[in-house]
Amino acid sequence: MAAITASMVGELRAKTDAPMMECKKALTEADGNMEKAEELLRIKLGNKAGKASGRITAEGVVTAFVDGAAGGMIEINCETDFVTKNDSFLAMANAAAMLVAKHNPADIAALGALPYEQDGFGPTLEDVRKGLIGKIGENMSFRRFKHFAGNGKLASYLHGTRIGVMVEFEGDDTSAKDVAMHIAAMKPVAIQASDVPADLIEKERAVAAGKAEEDRKTAEAEGKKPQPAEIVAKRIEGGVQKYLKEVSLHNQPFVKNDKQTVEQMLKAANTSIKGFTLYVVGEGIEKKVDDFAAEVAAQVAAAKAAA
């Protein structure tokens, strides 16, 4: 059984907004597995446990560059928020997005090998990165990037430096820009419900089934008759369909006018979305959370051993 620390409980609470004791119970039941604990909380507490699940703790920036029909978007990570405001770091990030757009490198290594000079460092982008690490005193890395070309026109939107969206489209430029802004705010996972990845659908189905099972246990404990199996099956499927509407771009209420869906807005503007890419800084990265009590205890033990 994994040890459940206060920092683990705090991290799960920050992600879910669930009560501290519920977070501790979920972590204990999940044997310390953060993702499993988060899923257990969703089953027990419903959507209340998902309100803050999109919070990301890793630092860095996302930036984009569009030059006609070609574009590039990149995420660069660092250790602290302080560096994300450094002019040299931002200049390198913007240059990297431009290099992605212009050269379409095959991978991170190929991107780093491209010619670029800045702040007296060079002759490659990788040399500049290493030089800035020494100058600023903090590690930084190119995490991911994407090159865009050949799938229609491009519209980009950056929400500060933490969220970036690139939209491939045909039609009205202003409408496409509005959709990019909408994607940054609402974070859809696909254009249409039929495009939502199967693994996400099955995960949502499992959560809905788990919630139904919790309701059955509660009903039995209260001496009530559980719902018939066919009703439960409809509830589960209804939950899945609700999820699909919430995460598919076309079905979402348009953020600038919630009286119409994005699909309706696009149809009125004679515009179609061919594809989109959403980057959120640190998405999928687990930030190291120190257990300070354990750290202090280790330091005391080391001091005693050295005495």
Curated annotation (Swiss-Prot):
Pfam families reported in the protein's UniProt record: EF_TS
Keywords: Cytoplasm, Elongation factor, Protein biosynthesis
One cellular component (GO) term of this entry: cytoplasm
Entry-linked InterPro entries: EF-Ts_dimer_sf, Transl_elong_EFTs/EF1B, Transl_elong_EFTs/EF1B_dimer, Transl_elong_Ts_CS, UBA-like_sf
Keyword Protein biosynthesis on entry: yes
Region (Involved in Mg(2+) ion dislocation from EF-Tu): 80-83
Molecular function as annotated in GO: translation elongation factor activity
Superkingdom of the organism of origin: Bacteria
CDD domains, sorted: UBA_EF-Ts
Location within or outside the cell: Cytoplasm
Functional description taken from the UniProt entry: Associates with the EF-Tu.GDP complex and induces the exchange of GDP to GTP. It remains bound to the aminoacyl-tRNA.EF-Tu.GTP complex up to the GTP hydrolysis stage on the ribosome.
HAMAP family registered for this protein in UniProt: EF_Ts (MF_00050)
Official protein name in the record: Elongation factor Ts
Organism, as annotated: Variovorax paradoxus (strain S110)
Annotated gene: tsf
